[in-house]
Each structure stands twice: as structure tokens, then as C-alpha cells.
A protein has these predicted regions:
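The −1 position to Zn-ligating cysteines in a subset of zinc-ribbon hairpins
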Residues: 43, 47, 265, 329
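Conserved alpha-helical substructure of the radical SAM core
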Residues: 2-133, 144, 148, 152, ...
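Residues that line or immediately flank small-molecule/substrate-binding pockets and catalytic motifs
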Residues: 55, 87, 138, 207, ...
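Radical SAM enzyme [4Fe-4S]-AdoMet core and its adjacent flexible, acidic
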Residues: 1-2, 7-10, 39, 63, ...
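Short, hydrophobic secondary-structure boundary micro-motifs
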Residues: 84, 175-176, 317-318
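Flexible mid-to-C-terminal extensions adjoining Fe-S/redox cofactors in radical SAM and related proteins
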Residues: 1-32, 54, 258, 282-283, ...
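Short, solvent-exposed turn/loop segments enriched in Gly/Ser/Thr/Pro and often Arg
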Residues: 88-89, 246, 332
Length: 359
């Protein structure tokens, strides 16, 4: 493990971490992904009303075991820095999940888990120690609100699992992620206090985004105003190394800073920052475009990942995304901040270069 507790959220979220791969990685046209995010199942034991994959995962797709094994072979052969086990569905529902984690851990590649935390049993605790960090969905303070959001009364079970993990995890960073939505925005202060009491290393707030255009998902302006007023009352006591709540409210209730990049390409794609693998086997370069075939560079059900990456199709999609980024069309993507940092670094040389296996 490369991390050391206590985590500093300012560093974990610092987009300047993209400078290191930009400086150190050569021959960018043949590079492996710096990191990879795996969304290998659409199955989930929750039914969160704000889920950004709600419609897209209705077909209940799962990448089959033999294809996952082949993908892990590619991950190890390519020497990817960090692997996120993440969204779409709940990664801990994947059959033979523990075997895949063990295999990657034995290769010394760093891993992170983004999970709702409910299926983590006592027998899984040794496995959890193999992650660089674990981020658990932390959606409410009240039982009733948890049930409204997820469809289940899971608060007590989840809090119990967090306490168990916190008791045994030494090197692994244990964080919490709260999606701010129409059911929990009045509980943000109690959620913050609960996370502090449970002893997690950080708490990230992410305002709900209506990626699928279903309506009634994102906060209204009135609800954002309420949130801002609530946070203002505790602002002096907020620990910015623990939470991004102050930043969220200063940005008008948005996770990403509302600035538009224009006039330069998507440097993140040029340095092969991240590959996203979806539960239908599709490979994408940007999370907001997952499911849109216009931006898909290939499918691991049809051929090996190593045949897709740096292929002609891959290069074509990079050109398309470069064009869109130059015109200021990109939004709700972490690469926007990376690109802003790199553009400034290219022009001025300014920025703090440090290694982080996850982009």
C-alpha cells in the first residue's frame, strides 16, 4: 500500500496529480491507461432513486467471468497504476469478486473500491485490507431517509459495517461519499456529524446529477439555497481536509467548478488517463459518455482490451473529444479540472507534481 493515514482530502481531490503522468510518461500514442475504472455489473442490492445508471442498468447486464479474467490479464500485463472497482451496479455482487481482488493485489497494482458497503461481511475483512482506499455510500442520518433513498432500511447495518472496518483497517483509507439529493439535503449537517463520529477518514459530498434526463433528480435553486444556509451555520467548524462541503456550497451546489475550457484539447485523453469498462463490455474514455455508442472505442466481449486500446477507433474518439473540448462542450467530468491544470502547466510550468495511482 502506498497510502498513510490520516487522509487529506485536499490532496486526494487535487487535480494537480495529473502533472506527474504528463511529465513522466513517454510515447503517449502507445501508452496503457494510467488508471482504469471498472463498472462490470449492472446488478445492485439498492434501488437509489437518484442513481445515474437507473435506466441504463435496467437490462441487468454483467460481464461474464471468462471475460473478466481476460481483462484482469490485460490489466496486469499492461502494468496499470490503479484500478477502481466502481459503479453501474454494486461491485461486491460480482461472482468471484474476491478472487479478482486477490489476483490484482498479488501483482502490486493499487486498487480502490466504491461500494454501498452493505454486503461486506466479517469474512471479507481481510480482503478489504488489500485496497488502497474504500469509499462507502453514506446517504442519510435518519433511518427513514435511508429507506426513501435506497428502498431499504439499511442505516444500522451500514453503520455497523463501517465501525467494523474502521476497527481493523490500518493502511487502507476508509472514506464516505454522500450524493446530495432531494431527500437528504436537509440532513447534511447530521450526516457530517455522523461521519465524524464513525471515524471515517473523509466525507465527499456529490450533488446529484441527472445524467439520464429523468427529471426531479437534481436540487432546485430553492433547495440549493437551503443547503447553503445550513452549511453557513457550521462553516467555521468545517475541516477541509475531511470534507469538500465548503467547496460544494461555494460552487453553487455543484461538484465540479462551473468553468468552461475552450481553445485547447483534452490532455487527459492524450496521456491515456483513464479507461472506463462498462457492464455491457463497452470501453469509454469519459464517464459522462458511458452508454453512448458515439464515444465507445470497443467492447471486451468482442476482443481483448489490448486490441481496443490505442486502436484506430480509440484515436478517432480522442480526436472527437478533443474537438468537443476545444469548443467548450464538455461538462460533469473530472478531466475538465485535469485539463485546466495541464494547460496552465504547459503555459507557465506552474503546479505541484506528485504521484497518485488513481486519475
Amino acid at each position: 500500500m502506498i497510502n498513510t493515514k490520516k487522509a487529506d482530502l485536499n490532496k486526494l481531490l487535487n487535480p494537480e496529480k495529473v502533472i506527474w503522468p504528463y511529465k513522466e510518461r513517454k510515447d503517449k500514442t502507445s501508452l496503457a491507461p494510467f488508471s482504469m475504472e471498472l463498472h462490470l455489473t449492472s446488478l445492485c442490492n439498492f434501488s437509489c432513486y437518484h442513481c445515474s445508471y437507473q435506466d441504463r442498468r435496467s437490462n441487468r447486464s454483467v460481464v461474464d467471468g471468462s471475460t473478466i479474467k481476460g481483462l484482469i490479464d490485460s490489466i496486469i500485463d499492461l502494468g496499470i497504476n490503479g484500478v477502481y472497482w466502481s459503479g453501474g451496479g454494486e461491485p461486491t455482487t460480482i461472482k468471484d469478486f474476491t478472487k479478482y481482488i486477490d489476483r490484482i493485489a498479488n501483482s502490486k497494482i493499487e486498487q480502490a473500491l466504491i461500494t454501498n458497503g452493505l454486503l461486506i461481511s466479517d469474512k471479507w475483512i481481510p480482503l478489504m485490507k488489500k485496497f488502497n482506499y474504500i469509499a462507502i455510500s453514506f446517504q442519510a442520518s435518519r433511518k427513514e431517509t435511508y429507506e426513501k433513498i435506497t428502498g431499504y432500511d439499511v442505516r444500522d447495518k451500514l453503520f455497523s459495517n463501517i465501525r467494523k472496518l474502521n476497527d481493523v483497517l490500518d493502511g487502507t483509507i476508509l472514506g464516505a461519499r454522500c450524493v446530495i439529493n432531494k431527500y437528504n439535503y436537509k440532513e447534511i449537517v447530521p450526516i457530517y456529524n455522523d461521519a465524524k463520529e464513525l471515524g471515517v477518514d473523509y466525507l465527499i459530498f456529490i450533488p446529484a446529477v441527472d445524467y439520464e434526463k429523468r427529471g426531479n433528480v437534481e436540487l432546485s435553486e430553492e433547495e440549493k439555497d437551503y443547503l447553503r444556509d445550513e452549511v453557513k451555520d457550521i462553516e467555521s467548524s468545517l475541516d477541509d481536509s475531511f470534507t469538500n462541503l465548503r467547496r460544494i456550497t461555494k460552487q453553487g451546489g455543484a461538484y465540479y467548478k462551473k468553468e468552461v475550457n475552450r481553445g485547447f484539447p483534452c490532455y487527459a485523453n492524450q496521456i491515456r488517463a483513464t479507461a472506463f469498462i462498462n457492464y455491457d463490455g463497452g470501453v469509454w474514455l469519459c464517464q459522462p459518455h458511458i452508454g453512448n455508442q458515439k464515444y465507445c472505442i470497443g467492447n471486451i466481449n468482442d476482443c481483448k482490451f489490448t486490441e481496443i486500446w490505442n486502436s484506430q477507433r480509440h484515436c478517432e474518439v480522442i480526436e472527437l473529444l478533443d474537438s468537443e473540448h476545444e469548443m467548450g462542450k464538455c461538462k460533469n467530468c473530472r478531466s475538465i479540472a485535469y485539463n485546466r491544470v495541464l494547460h496552465n502547466y504547459i503555459l507557465t510550468g506552474a503546479g505541484n507534481s506528485f504521484h497518485d495511482p488513481f486519475l
